[in-house]
Amino acid sequence: MSGTGQSHAADAAPDSDPGQAAVALAYQHFEPRAYLRNNYAPPRGDLSSPDGVGPWKLRCLAQTFATGEVSGRALIDIGSGPTIYQLLSACAHFEDITMTDFLEVNRQELGLWLREEPGAFDWSVYSQHVCLIEGKGESCQEKERQLRARVKRILPIDVHQPQPLGTGSLAPLPADALVSAFCLEAVSPDLASFQRALDHITTLLRSGGHLLLIGALEESWYLAGEARLAVVPVCEEEVREALARSGYEVRDLRTYVMPAHLRTGVDDVKGIFFAWAQKKVGV
């Protein structure tokens, strides 16, 4: 669903599965700036209305981190895409953050922002909004400074491999928490592949650790420049079942219906889900 915050992270690499190989090939045409324009500039990037999709996602994340239960030392963002908003509330709770993406162009886009280089996408509206809803009196500059300081590395990832980060990864493993936004459904050719990808990333998480998963509901395609990318449509119950099969207790699962004025023709998304799940001890 390129709809709202997706990080459609092209986390599929060519391997023995022809469906996954086709996904990986399609993502070679992914244009990060077009994706950002479609989803993070107005109208979807308008954060002034509390009913908008952007405020909803940021609120879900902020409220979950405000519980104090999702914390630790190391967090991995799975399939970051070219976006950083999904970590704005997380960065106060983890001192070592790893961002990941299959596509080099997305990793380069993230690097521009982290290094504060000219031409980097401006996330300050998102940072300001997070500071507002968290209510700690923090400035957006302080928020962004903290996030930049705590992102220690940007790594390649392939969620369709049993070891998504490869062997000898530089990320501290197992992580205390995972975040993933608009990745798994956007890079999986079918529901079985989605389930396997979820199983694979779960190996990166310690027992008792937390997964915050954001994704598209009932979406089959989205645009990112010249690329028209297929998405496996999932419903709320399928997400819940997949999490249970991967060994999670679902702590919270919320859904958002995409309003008509935000259905802008860049995808066919019907809604968004936010899941907070905890990996069962012993899994």
Swiss-Prot record:
NCBIfam families membership: GntF_guanitoxin
Pathway linked to the protein: Catecholamine biosynthesis; (R)-adrenaline biosynthesis; (R)-adrenaline from (R)-noradrenaline: step 1/1
Top-level EC class as recorded in UniProt: transferase
Reaction(s) catalysed by this chain's protein: phenylethanolamine + S-adenosyl-L-methionine = N-methylphenylethanolamine + S-adenosyl-L-homocysteine + H(+); (R)-noradrenaline + S-adenosyl-L-methionine = (R)-adrenaline + S-adenosyl-L-homocysteine + H(+); (R)-normetanephrine + S-adenosyl-L-methionine = (R)-metanephrine + S-adenosyl-L-homocysteine + H(+); (R)-octopamine + S-adenosyl-L-methionine = (R)-synephrine + S-adenosyl-L-homocysteine + H(+)
Record key words, sorted: Catecholamine biosynthesis, Methyltransferase, Phosphoprotein, S-adenosyl-L-methionine, Transferase
Coiled-coil regions listed in the entry: none
Record keyword S-adenosyl-L-methionine present: yes
Binding-site residues, octopamine: E219, D267
Assigned EC number: 2.1.1.28
One GO biological process term: epinephrine biosynthetic process
Keyword hit for tRNA-binding: no
Gene (UniProt): PNMT
A Gene Ontology cellular-component term: cytosol
Protein name from the UniProt record: Phenylethanolamine N-methyltransferase
Positions contributing to S-adenosyl-L-methionine binding: Y35, Y40, G79, S80, Y85, D101, N106, D158, V159, A181
Family classification: Belongs to the class I-like SAM-binding methyltransferase superfamily. NNMT/PNMT/TEMT family.
A Pfam family per the record: NNMT_PNMT_TEMT
TM stretches of this protein: none
A GO MF label: phenylethanolamine N-methyltransferase activity
Xref: InterPro entries: NNMT/PNMT/TEMT_CS, NNMT_TEMT_trans, SAM-dep_methyltransferase, SAM-dependent_MTases_sf
Phosphoserine modified-residue sites: S7
Chain's role: Catalyzes the transmethylation of nonepinephrine (noradrenaline) to form epinephrine (adrenaline), using S-adenosyl-L-methionine as the methyl donor. Other substrates include phenylethanolamine, octopamine and normetanephrine.
